[in-house]
């Protein structure tokens, strides 16, 4: 394990009202990444991590579904923010990806379960690179998203939030996009060319078996989960950059995530693109609760190995 003195804890800890855990004793590391440079509609996702950490203090430590208190059972450590565009507004995309990768890789190497909170979706390229550095086995990137995010470039940048899954594909990793409901022609052509197994939101709405089909389509045992919060129904998740109609419902999403953790080895996850809405806390609270549910599902999967 890397020396705990190597890492700096953040000014705000996830669920710090319930438990603050040292790096050495924590199984889960929360990584705030308040980076925003390329959002193309509603702005504000650089404020997402801080809002989620603040909202986490309102969560109940006890999870009634799991019958445990994950923050006590696992230990959660929140590191200092990476790639903070609030402090460094000129931080370029390639430099951001490098900083995120170099910052997260030691956590992966130490066997921590990383939960990264953004920030714009372009961040995921750096998170996935860190996962590759920390594991020698192949893994699939499961993508919850309203959009394909598979453009080669957008607005002159290859590290635009609309290009992140194209960069992931270039890393040689299989992907599974879920809840997709908006793509461009370039992305449609790529999906056909690469035979990418997309689960379209309009088809999922009429298919009660989509969870089984989605999990059956994953060809690797290891999985990284990337969640753009606009993958959810904006009726309860309005605080996103582009709130596409439709998307995952709350319990539909939880059912999928729990099954995913039960059947696959989830090596890490991120939650991206939360942009808080002034005068409302529903989006950041729901995101904080989702992050905590994912930690709990991971903990459940670890107990079943014993």
UniProtKB/Swiss-Prot annotation:
Q: What Pfam families does UniProt report for this protein, alphabetically?
A: Arginase
Give the pathway annotation.
Amine and polyamine biosynthesis; spermidine biosynthesis
UniProt keyword terms in alphabetical order: Hydrolase, Manganese, Metal-binding, Spermidine biosynthesis
Any idea which positions bind Mn(2+) 2? 145, 147, 228, 230
**GO function term, MF aspect, one:** agmatinase activity
Swapping residue 187 to A leads to an effect described as: Retains 50% of activity
Family in the record: Belongs to the arginase family.
Protein name per UniProt: N(1)-aminopropylagmatine ureohydrolase
* Species the sequence originates in: Synechocystis sp. (strain ATCC 27184 / PCC 6803 / Kazusa)
- Gene encoding the protein: speB1
